[in-house]
Amino acid sequence: MDIQFLGTGAGQPSKARNVSSLALKLLDEINEVWLFDCGEGTQNRILETTIRPRKVSKIFITHLHGDHIFGLPGFLSSRAFQANEEQTDLEIYGPQGIKSFVLTSLRVSGSRLPYRIHFHEFDQDSLGKILETDKFTVYAEELDHTIFCVGYRVMQKDLEGTLDAEKLKAAGVPFGPLFGKIKNGQDLVLEDGTEIKAADYISAPRPGKIITILGDTRKTGASVRLAVNADVLVHESTYGKGDEKIARNHGHSTNMQAAQVAVEAGAKRLLLNHISARFLSKDISKLKKDAATIFENVHVVKDLEEVEI
């Protein structure tokens, strides 16, 4: 499981940072990629990665500001031109209005897609659990921005315990099909009468990962709730230390406020995202250094960077 950042800038693209988009790569878990936001130029960034567009099965939009959605029509259209690849349907989750934006863009441009898009729109009254599969659950909660904006909490369900092969061998269980039966929870009786209780040879379930991905927001309690015990918290850092007033006026957060959220939530790792173009390389190190005085395990991400979860 990895996150690859396709756009880490704020508001408008710069030479170093594209506008908002990241890919949650779940290839080992479910052979899918989930996209979070799709700012202008997202498909160009994808061309610089190993991501195959048809593997993108779900797109989660945080809000309808242009730097988070203007890349959708282009990506959806280009996804239709994947030669020699099976066309797969796509799901888009986002605030009310995302369906109208996408369909209007496709209609006006005369674009026809050989796959279906299934839209899941929500508003303030229909948040909470928005998706549940056999391996993942996704929650959405409203943040505090200048327009309706949400954050997402992606929870991997507990993983099966591992089989203790050495212990089984010591108990006289021959390697082969019996191992598979025990792994599936089946109790056995060996030829010599030895009873094998599957539970004695399988470790306890391992907790799944928790990934919190926030849209644009002021510091708010919703951010903390979404990030409780998160393995990774992706939080915007449009402004730096001392800019709390201007950040609030524009519906954004500082690096220090993001660090405070991480502390209050008990998150394990903080990734600062949505970085303003006014921060030069030397200022980026200061963003991290200042935030680390509050929350030590912090990192400022950059475009195309891949982070293992």
Swiss-Prot record:
Regarding protein family, the annotation reads:
Belongs to the RNase Z family.
- Pfam families named in the record: Lactamase_B
Q: What binding partners and quaternary form does the record give? A: Homodimer.
Annotated positions binding Zn(2+) 1? 63, 65, 145, 216
EC number(s) from the headed UniProt entry: 3.1.26.11
Which InterPro entries did the record assign?
Answer: Metallo-B-lactamas (IPR001279), RibonucZ/Hydroxyglut_hydro (IPR036866), RNase_Z/BN (IPR013471)
Q: What is this protein called?
A: Ribonuclease Z
Write out the residues that bind Zn(2+) 2.
67-68, 216, 274
Q: Which UniProt keywords apply?
A: Endonuclease, Hydrolase, Metal-binding, Nuclease, tRNA processing, Zinc
**Per the entry, which co-factors are needed?**
Zn(2+)
Q: Which Gene3D superfamilies match?
A: Ribonuclease Z/Hydroxyacylglutathione hydrolase-like
Quote the function comment for this protein.
Zinc phosphodiesterase, which displays some tRNA 3'-processing endonuclease activity. Probably involved in tRNA maturation, by removing a 3'-trailer from precursor tRNA.
